[in-house]
């Protein structure tokens, strides 16, 4: 034996497999202000105790592996290991638990959402001892938040750039999302902006396809923006999707957008990846571009109640990585979103400090230490009859985005935009006068129809349209 081997043997190394809970379940641990805290919904395999399951999550997402290894003795596990410090049963489910895990800050690279997720939600989600695993929430410590630059500009700077205050911003996704030529696409952008919208938007899968290459789209949209601004006297924008197959190509598209003088670009941050998103956010900050974020592919990760990752975690990650807008669901439209849970992560996007509130799905108190806020974007299956509810639910600091609810107007795109702008202005005025939007919403819209034939036509088209399905994402 070499002296090194003898030394290891003398301190008690014993080959083999031991229970995770012996090392990683520490119910007496007092969490530190610098720890990253995670709340996991854990469903163990039959026969696996909750303590062992929670400890396995802590181990496999930090320093642990399936067997004892010699090199454990070459570092301080007590300094670097994750710890399952609390377990609580889920009401109504005999074999499901919320397991709380604390991770030392030294486990994570500064300013890297990619590294944070690689550790916390990496291989552990395929662990055989677990039937299902879902990351419900994270507490990001102040010390780690300050290593990120966050959103390129934030809510107040965006309002100052646009010179628009006291109401939600109004947008529209151009439809059909695929198949239009660049010139016809630009025409639709112009008509919507001229009609009164603040923004129009590329859909998430509009990149650079044979029917419309990105450079042509950027040119025609920039022309539409300039023409609409000249006619209305308002600052306008179109979310030019810079998402591409490589980071280099993505930045090239953002550079061209800046050269055209447009105010905002867009990125699909989940499909594009957090490394690409953070790079684009840094470029936008340095070059005066706003950054709109689409969450395409999020439901693959967050739709199932028992497995995956809740969107509130993805929302926090986006605020770290960088984005000025992000899609958040509508509560009232065609896409998933229960009211209290949606408003919970909307507050996490906008507010500087959010208290723990399990009734809204918030597991930890979170401080953002002056990191700029992100505007939530309500988009998907909404129309003029939804305007009072959207104004009441999301408030002024939001973007309300009507795609089919603008372009589906029987008189055309510009009248569709007029209808939405009139409905929004009517709701904001009624709210400012002290009227109850939740109770009087339909009356407010009908009153506005008397002096807006465009709104009256829109109300007639969509008076029967509802999306009444039960949300999957509910409080336990």
Curated annotation (Swiss-Prot):
One of its GO terms (cellular component) is chloroplast. Binds 1 Mg(2+) ion per subunit. Substrate binds at residues 123, 173, 177, 295, 327, 379. It is an enzyme of class 4 (lyase). Gene3D superfamilies: Ribulose bisphosphate carboxylase, large subunit, C-terminal domain, RuBisCO large subunit, N-terminal domain. The active site is at residues 175, 294. Keywords: Acetylation, Calvin cycle, Carbon dioxide fixation, Chloroplast, Disulfide bond, Lyase, Magnesium, Metal-binding, Methylation, Monooxygenase, Oxidoreductase, Photorespiration, Photosynthesis, Plastid. The record marks 334 as: Transition state stabilizer. GO terms for biological process: photorespiration; reductive pentose-phosphate cycle. Coiled coil: none annotated. Pfam families: RuBisCO_large, RuBisCO_large_N. The modification N6-carboxylysine is found at residue 201. InterPro entries: RuBisCO, RuBisCo_large_chain_AS, RuBisCO_lsu_C, RuBisCO_lsu_C_sf, RuBisCO_lsu_fd_N, RuBisCO_lsu_N_sf, RuBisCO_lsuI. The modification N6,N6,N6-trimethyllysine is found at residue 14. The disulfide bond which can form in the large chain dimeric partners within the hexadecamer appears to be associated with oxidative stress and protein turnover. It is found in: Plastid, Chloroplast. The keyword Acetylation applies. Belongs to the RuBisCO large chain family. Type I subfamily. The basic functional RuBisCO is composed of a large chain homodimer in a 'head-to-tail' conformation. In form I RuBisCO this homodimer is arranged in a barrel-like tetramer with the small subunits forming a tetrameric 'cap' on each end of the 'barrel'. Heterohexadecamer of 8 large chains and 8 small chains; disulfide-linked. The disulfide link is formed within the large subunit homodimers. RuBisCO catalyzes two reactions: the carboxylation of D-ribulose 1,5-bisphosphate, the primary event in carbon dioxide fixation, as well as the oxidative fragmentation of the pentose substrate in the photorespiration process. Both reactions occur simultaneously and in competition at the same active site. This is Ribulose bisphosphate carboxylase large chain. It comes from Arenaria drummondii.
């Amino acid at each position: 034996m070499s002296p090194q081997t003898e030394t290891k043997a003398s301190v008690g190394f014993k080959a083999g497999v031991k229970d995770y809970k012996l090392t990683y379940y520490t119910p007496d641990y007092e969490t530190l202000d610098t720890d990253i805290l995670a709340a996991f919904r854990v469903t163990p395999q039959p026969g696996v105790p909750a303590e062992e399951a929670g400890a396995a999550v802590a181990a496999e997402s930090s320093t642990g592996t399936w067997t004892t290894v010699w090199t454990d003795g070459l570092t301080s596990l007590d300094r670097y290991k994750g710890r399952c410090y609390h377990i609580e049963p889920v009401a109504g489910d005999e074999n499901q638990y919320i397991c709380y895990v604390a991770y030392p800050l030294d486990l994570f690279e500064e300013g890297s959402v990619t590294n944070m997720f690689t550790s916390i939600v990496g291989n552990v989600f395929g662990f055989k001892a677990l039937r299902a695993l879902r990351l419900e929430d994270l507490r990001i410590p102040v010390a780690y938040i300050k290593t990120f630059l966050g959103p390129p500009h934030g809510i107040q700077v965006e309002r100052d750039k646009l010179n628009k205050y006291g109401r939600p911003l109004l947008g529209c996704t151009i439809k059909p999302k695929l198949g239009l030529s660049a010139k016809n696409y630009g025409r639709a952008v112009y008509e919507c902006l001229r009609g009164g919208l603040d923004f129009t938007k590329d859909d998430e899968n509009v990149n650079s396809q044979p029917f419309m290459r990105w450079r042509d789209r950027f040119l025609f949209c920039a022309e539409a923006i300039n023409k609409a601004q000249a006619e209305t006297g308002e600052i306008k924008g179109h979310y030019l999707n810079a998402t591409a197959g490589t980071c280099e190509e993505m930045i090239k598209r953002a550079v061209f957008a800046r050269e055209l003088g447009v105010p905002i670009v867009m990125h699909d941050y989940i499909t594009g990846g957090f490394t690409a998103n953070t790079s684009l956010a840094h470029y936008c900050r340095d070059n005066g571009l706003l950054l709109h974020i689409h969450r395409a592919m999020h439901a693959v990760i967050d739709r199932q109640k028992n497995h995956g990752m809740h969107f509130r975690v993805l929302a926090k990650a986006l605020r770290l990585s960088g984005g000025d807008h992000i899609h958040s669901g509508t509560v009232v439209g065609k896409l998933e979103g229960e009211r209290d849970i949606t408003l919970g992560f909307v507050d996490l996007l906008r507010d500087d400090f959010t208290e723990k509130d399990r009734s809204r799905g918030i597991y930890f108190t979170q401080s953002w230490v002056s990191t700029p806020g992100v505007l939530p974007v309500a988009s998907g299956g909404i129309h003029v009859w939804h305007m009072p509810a959207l104004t009441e639910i999301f408030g002024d600091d939001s973007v309300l985005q009507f795609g089919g609810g603008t372009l589906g107007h029987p008189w055309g795109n510009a009248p569709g935009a007029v209808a939405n702008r009139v409905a929004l202005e009517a709701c904001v005025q009624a709210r400012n006068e002290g009227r109850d939007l939740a109770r009087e919403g339909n009356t407010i819209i009908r009153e506005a129809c008397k002096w807006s034939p465009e709104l009256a036509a829109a109300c007639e088209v969509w008076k029967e349209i509802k999306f009444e399905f039960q949300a999957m994402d509910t409080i336990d």
